[in-house]
A protein has these predicted regions:
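FMN-binding flavodoxin-like domain, especially the glycine-rich phosphate-binding loop
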Residues: 22-25, 47-52, 66-71, 76-186
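Exposed boundary/loop context
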Residues: 3, 10-11, 28, 71, ...
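Short, Lys/Arg-enriched N-terminal segments with co-localized hydrophobic residues
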Residues: 1-20
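Short acidic low-complexity segments
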Residues: 54-65
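N-terminal beta1-alpha1 ligand-phosphate binding loop
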Residues: 22-47
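Low-complexity, compositionally biased segments
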Residues: 7, 13-14, 39, 63, ...
Length: 186
């Protein structure tokens, strides 16, 4: 239920994405190929009350016992990775906070497109209570592939932009990304 006002009584109130959870238990479930999404998961775990955490780890049946799920993914071809999509498709009647990383950054529109694709795998009985995405560094092999492509006379017109994006991504998720995530959580 959406809240317009918060009244503090004798228990902790956590506000997240317009929803109020009174000491609600949660699980943090994530998939991380390069460690970027794991960093976001660790930050969420650091912020939230540890005693309310039912599960922290990769997709597992134990993680779905909580009503509130923080679900993290890495981006694969404009969508969440297949393990996360499979996990999401099985959920019913949950509150879900989506978080993820993508190698291509600098475009909120791109992040929104990814999140839109991810949400298509989520049953309508679930409620999305929040979402966050940021850029994440990519494996060095990606840059090597771009450089090799550039050597070809038939390389893509945007190859220099791809290499530049790769180099910008090396520091992500960075302190600013973590602060933005924190602000979404608290």
């Amino acid at each position: 239920k959406l809240i317009n006002q918060v009244v503090l009584i004798d228990y902790t109130i956590i506000i997240l994405g317009g929803y109020c959870m009174y000491n609600e238990n949660y699980s943090i479930i994530f998939s991380s190929m390069t460690g970027n999404t794991r960093k976001l998961a660790d930050k969420i775990h650091e912020i939230l009350p540890k005693e309310s955490c039912d599960y922290f780890g990769t997709a597992d049946a134990q993680g779905i016992k909580s009503e509130l799920l923080y679900i993290g993914f890495w981006t694969d071809k404009g969508n969440a990775d297949s393990d996360t999509l499979d996990f999401l498709s099985k959920l019913k009647n949950k509150k879900i906070f989506l978080f993820g990383t993508a190698g291509f950054g600098g475009s909120n529109a791109y992040f929104q497109k990814i999140l839109g694709n991810v949400k298509m795998s989520i049953d309508s009985s679930n409620t999305i209570v929040g979402e966050y995405m940021c850029q994440g560094k990519m494996p060095q092999s990606v840059r090597e592939r771009y450089v090799k492509m550039k050597e070809s006379p038939k390389h893509p017109d945007n190859i220099d932009a791809l290499i530049e994006n790769f180099d910008k991504a090396l520091s992500h998720p960075d302190a600013d990304d973590m602060e933005q995530l924190k602000n979404m959580i608290i």
